[in-house]
Amino acid sequence: MRFTHRITNSRLGFFLLSAFTGLLVGSSTVALIECVDFLQGLLFGEPATDDPNQLDSRFSGWSVLLVPIFGGIVISVLLRFIPGQRFHGIPDVMEASALRAGKMDVRSGVSAAIATTLSLGTGAPLGREGPAVHIGASLTSWLAEKFNLGRTQSLTLLGCAAAAAVTASFNTPIAGVIFALEVVVGYYALRVFAPVVIAAMGAVIIRHSIYGNRPEFTLPDYQIGSLWELPVFALLGFVAAFVVQGFIYLVIFCRAGWDKASAPVWIRPAFAGVLIGAMALYYPLALGVGYEGTSLALNENLPLVLLAGLLLAKVLGGAVAIGSGTPGGVFSPALFIGAMLGGVYWYVATALIPAELSSQGVYSVVGMAAIASAMLGAPISTLLIVFELTIDYDLVIAVMLAAAMASTFMQLMPHSSFFRWQLAERGINLNSGRDQGLLRTKTIDEFVTQNFIRVNSAVTLTAVETSMYSHRRYIAVVLNDNEEFIGSLSTDELVAGVVTDREATCKSAMNASEHAIPDSTSLLAALQSLNELDTNYAPVTKTGDDAEEVVGVIYRSDVLKALYDMMRAARSEEYGVN
C-alpha cells in the first residue's frame, strides 16, 4: 500500500503508470486484432493476396452465408448469459468518465473481448476499435482500483486507455491522443495531456513491434484539382450528415422491429446473422471490419455499381447488427461507408458538373472524413485519423471543410452523433456539460433532510405554529385520518394563514400533495420542479404499495449548493492539480 501510494502521488510515478497502461492496452488491442484475423482465416480461409488493390477471394462461396449465421447463433448463446443482456462499448466509457469517476466493471471488458472476437471473426459488418477502447478502459479501471487512485487520476487513466487503444488499432498516435481528450475525457488540459501522450507512445511501441511503421491505407499522390471545388466538398459534408442520421434511424427501426416482434433479446443476433449472411452473398466485401473494401475504394478500384451496393450493404448490415445487439464498433464502418459514399458522390458530381473535378480517390478520402466526423462527433480527432491513416496532407483543406460541415449539420439534426444518441437512449445527456450530466444522474435522496413535523389535517394553524416552534422545524407534513400524506405547510404559508384566520385548520392553508417529489428524482429534475412550483422546498415521498410515505424534505438551497459543488468539481478536474 505504501509503495502504490508513493508511485501514484508523484508525477514521475503516475507517468510510469501511464506508460504501463499504454503497453497493457496496446497489447490487448493487438491481441484483439490477431484473434479476429485468426478466426476469420480459420472460418473464411486465408487471403489469396496481400495486395490491397485486389479483391479478397476468401470472402466467396457459401462461407459468406453460413459463417455469419453461425456467428449470430454463438453470440445469441453468449448474450443469454451476459448480465443485462447487453455488450458494452465507447458510450459506456464516456458515461464512466462523465458520471462514474472512471469506474467500470472489468468483467464487461472480458465479455466484450470474447464477444467482439466472435462477432467480427464470423463477419459481423462492424468495427473493432470501439470494443478495443472499452476493453482497455475496463482494464485501466481495474488498475485504478488496485492502485487506490483518486477521481482525477482515474479519469486520466481512462483517457490513457482510450488513446492507447485507438493508437494501437489504427497506428495513429496523434489522433489517439486527441480522441481521448475530445470524446472520453471531454476536455483539454495540460495535466491530462502528458500522461495520455505517454500512454499513446507505449501503444505505438507495441504496434510497431508487431506490424511495423506502415500506414493502414497506401494511396497514390492525390491532389485537389481546383479551389473552386470547395463548395462541392462542403456539400459532401452535408450529404454525409444525412447518411449518418439515416443510419441511426435504421438502427432505431431495427430495434423497434425486434421489440414489435417480441423477440427475446438474446436470440436477435442469430436472426441478424441470417440477414447479414444473405447480404454477403452479393456484397462479401461488406463483411467484417472492411478495410479491404475501403482500400479498394480509396485506390479507385471499384465501379459505381459496386460502390453503391457496398454503401447500402454496409449501412443496412451495420444497422441490423447493432440493432440486434451484436457487439462491435462504428469506427471502421464509418470509414468504409465514407469511402463508398465519396466514390458514389464523385460519379454523380461528374455527371452533373461540366467542369473537370478531382479524382474519385480524393472524394473517397474526403467522404471518409465527413462520415467519420458525423458518426463519432469528434471532428478534430477524425481529421487526424484520416491524415495518419493515409499519410496524405495535400487534401487538408477539402477534408477539413467536409468534416466541419458534417459536424455542423449533425448539431442541427435530432442526433448530434452516434455515441451521443446511444447515451440519450439511456437517459444520459452530455451535450450540456458533465456537471449537468451529473445532476441528471444524481438523485435527491442524499440531500433530503428531516427538518419537518407531521400534523393531522384537522389541527388548527395555531397548534401547528406552536408545534413548529417547540420542535424548531420549518415544514409541516399534513396527514389525513388514515395517516396518508395529503399536503405540506411551510412557515411562510403558516404565517399567511395565521394572519387570515388563526383557528382555521392547516388543511385550508397547505400545498396539495402534488407538490411532493419522489425520492428517485434527479437533482436536475428536482430543481426544475421547484422552479415550476415557485417554491423553496418540497416534501420527498417514497411511493409504497398503498400510499405515498414522506421520507423527508428537500430545499432549493441544498439543490443549488449541490449544483455549485459539482460545477466546481468539474472545473477542478479540467484545470486543477488533483
Report residues per predicted region:
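Alpha-helical transmembrane segments and immediately membrane-proximal extracytoplasmic
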Residues: 1-441, 445, 450-451, 455-467, ...
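Structural signal for short hydrophobic segments within the conserved structured cores
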Residues: 451-455, 508, 513-516
